[in-house]
């Protein structure tokens, strides 16, 4: 039986976790993957024709590559090939709601209409949560487009339980790691630590860097049980997760924060750790 071929189209990062996880599973399912990274997204279809890119069974535009959609659609339509888009985010939703930029209703509607037309170019649009799927259908009009949910997941060959090193004199380590953006709500973690600051047998560790780190450090100035660690390499992250006793997810109160299940939740669960995160409709009921 001939192997089916999937053409990954766009100026994407194959090592980004969403991409690497999906690509590994596709390869495990015996799909052949071809990469095409156009020099200029807008003229990708011309470059693909010039370079004689192999005709695949499916064209896949990976996450964040909204600007590659139209060119990929033009090329795939000429060959009667289906186009799949894995956006991971709505640019309109991020611009208007997550970044809290002030737009008139008219301009917001124009941005939404533009993205709706873009998404409708695809035959299949993946969602990473049921909330995003609902957003794509209600706000971007994708009811007639196949819109399955594929969760972000984790690289299970990397994120897995390590042998336990039991030490009776160590403190209970509560770990948060991330980029300290508003979606993460790291300040809420520091405030929670303050509520039990008298329990010195609990160590709160916040690992990473980002725009809200300075504020978190300010809030933690008088807290003896809150510690900060610098960024570490991605390959060392599983070991650090396994050293912790409890992992923390995200606690932002924005609509966006309620729409996602972050990588850290899947990674920590894959390491066999208990995770506390905010409640939202994004999480499966079972």
Predicted feature locations:
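Carbohydrate-associated surface elements
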Residues: 131, 153
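Nucleotide-activated donor-binding/catalytic signature segment of Leloir-type glycosyltransferases, i.e.
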Residues: 214-239, 243-246
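Nucleotide-sugar-dependent
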Residues: 93, 184, 233-240, 247-270, ...
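Membrane-proximal helix-turn-helix segments that form the acceptor-binding/catalytic region
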Residues: 48-50, 74-78, 105-125
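Active-site proximal beta-strand in glycosyltransferases
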Residues: 76-95
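Conserved donor-binding/catalytic core segment of Leloir-type glycosyltransferases
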Residues: 7, 167-193, 204-205
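Short donor-sugar binding/catalytic loops of nucleotide-sugar-dependent glycosyltransferases
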Residues: 12, 177-181, 196, 210, ...
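Glycosyltransferase donor-sugar binding loop
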Residues: 177, 203-216
